[in-house]
Structure formats: structure tokens, C-alpha cells
Amino acid sequence: MTDASRASSSGHGDTVGDLTTGSRRLVGQVRVVGSGLLGASIGLRLRQHGVDVILDYVSPAARSLAVDYGAGRLPAEGDAPVLVVVAVPPDVTSEIVARELASWPDALVTDVASVKVAPLAELRARGADVSRYIGSHPMAGRERGGAVSARADLFVGRPWVIAGHDDITYRRAAAVEDLALDLGATPIEMTPEEHDAGVALVSHAPQVVASLMATRLRDAPDAALGLAGQGVRDVTRIAGSDPALWTQILGANASRVAAVLSELRADLDRVVDALEAPDAPGSRRTLAESIGSGNGGVARLPGKHGQQTQFSSVIVMVDDTPGQLARLLTEIGEIGVNLEDLRLEHSPGAQLGLAEVSIVPEQEDRLVTELEARGWTVVGAFA
């Protein structure tokens, strides 16, 4: 079993406790090239551990902003990083990685780009020393980028893919795993090919679907948009992403994303055919099977601790006044129920909202009883 596999299967991946005690695995300077959301978030967490973080980026303004936010310091004479993390857009990742490999011959270099096959192939084509390069990718992010959106806890509990390859011979190759663990993430080993196929399915194709669905809203009547509830908001939540960045990501993983979307297109064609002739034999079965297949797929998504878990939802009415949501969350904690997920939905034209609280089924009855006893209006509960 590899080091990263041991970490994620032996309890070593339970990193939150390690972070709160201030322990760390990385020893030595870490150089972060890139001062956006990921680069600055990496710097913020490592600085909390006392790591000497060196920030560098092509934009002096962006770099200075990240430094001001406490994500690291400016480069200085005598720097000797043991690990270099490249956090730049995908279209320049291989170029910057090659430069860093040449500039720091005693350092391991990793990147956090959202594709892994293309950078490795480009580095080999450049003749770069890939024995000291390991691609990686944290499955974490936010809708808005830049250092101003950075968070020290961005990676806590999130998968961090380590995409190794056969040419790695560097003696301190485990430093990428140490980085992931110090950031609170769970290291997962994959080949570059496995990674790119996986993210095409769970990240890249969903971005396209969200954007295309949101496009349908551009010219929709105001009256129709006024009916929007949580369903359309869930489907389009990531549609506000950066077009320039996503053009690079999709282009770098084009064939794999196209394969997923081609399967989706075939399913959509079947649904459209059924809707155009709803009374034709088999049409209603097609519709039912489409919805049912989706039930099966979403049930396979892991919960926040990585396991596949069925949660119960308790829907609570919350007044749209300052402090009400905070009071609800505080009282759920006082009751002793662990919150697995939370969704909010505002009723158009009403001074209230609905909080959908996800919990393990065994705690549903107790939570409903305790909340109602404390004066909350529970409008529904279901598995």
C-alpha cells in the first residue's frame, strides 16, 4: 500500500485534529506560485502552521494583496524551498512548472491545476525533469476567485488527488501528501488518466450543464423568474463561473468531457422524444426510468465524511430577521444533533425563509420534538 493510501485508509486522513493542535508534517520553506483563490488559501493554512511560505506571481498587485492577507511573504535572497506549489491557470501550468523545476533543483514541484494528463505530457515534451514533479488537484473551490475569496479552511475534509507517474524518483516525493494533510485534506492516489476522467464526470460536465441551463433564464419572462425556487438555484449554482478559466479547463480535458456530454445528449434525446409524444407507447416509462435512474445516481454520492449516507431532512420556518438563522443553528447544536448539510430557500414576497436541515435519520424525531418545544415551526420532515 502506498503512503497516500495508508493515510486515507488508516485514520491518518482524520486531519482536523492535527490542524487544531498546530502540528505539521511539512518541514522547510514552501514556495507558492500563484496568488489566486487556491494559492492564497494554501498559504493561509500553512502560515497558521508556522510554515515559511514564499509567494510569487506574475502580477505584483495580486501577489501583494495575498501577502497583505497573510498568505505568505515576498521572495528574498537565499530562499531554498523544499516544495513548490504552482497554482496558475491551466494554459500556463506546464510552462511555470518547467521554470520552477529548473530554478529549484533541490525542490519537489507540484501543481493544483484541474487537469493532470496534459501538463505531464507537455513537461515531458519540454524535456523537463519530471522525476521531481507530481501533479495534484484539490477538489475544492468557490464561485468567486482571487485572494480576497481565500479561506484557510478551504481544503478541510476535501479530497486531494495526487496523480503520480512512473518517472518519479525524488526522495522526498511524500511532501505532496504532507501538504494535503497539513491543509486538512484527504489524499487520494489516482493516475493522471483516472483523475481527468473522474473530474470530467463530477466537475467539468456539470459546469457545462449548469451554464446551459442558466442560459435558458437570460430571456425568460420576469413573471417566470419570480417563480424560481431551490430547484433551479441548485442546478445553476455554479453557472456564475469565470468563462476564461473554464474555457481553458474544458479545452484541456475536451475528449473526456465530450464523452460524458454525448451520453447526456443521448438521454436528453430520449426524454425529448417521450415528451413530444407523451401518449405514445413507452413514453411514460421512459420518463419514469429517467427520473429513477437519477435517484440511483445521486444516492451514490458520498456524504461529507466520504461514505454513502442517506440523510433525513427537517424543514424549519425561519423569520427573515437578523440573528434568526444563527439562533437556529446554535439551538440545533445545544440539542446535540450533528448537522450534515443546510439549505436555505426564501419565499418570494414573504418575510420568512425555509431552512432544510439534513441529519442522520436516527436523530429526526428528537430534533423535531426539541425544535417545536423551543418555539420553532417545523413544516416538514422526510427521508
Please tell me what each predicted stretch does.
Residues 221-294:
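Interdomain hinge/lid region at the active-site interface
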Residues 154-240:
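Internal alpha-helical scaffold of NAD(P)-dependent oxidoreductase catalytic cores
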Residues 35-36:
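Glycine-rich Rossmann-fold phosphate-binding loop(s) that bind the pyrophosphate
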Residues 77-108:
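Rossmann-like NAD(P)-binding element
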Residues 297-383:
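A conserved regulatory-domain signal marking ACT and ACT-like small-molecule sensing domains
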Residues 39-40, 93:
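N-terminal Rossmann-fold NAD(P) dinucleotide-binding loop
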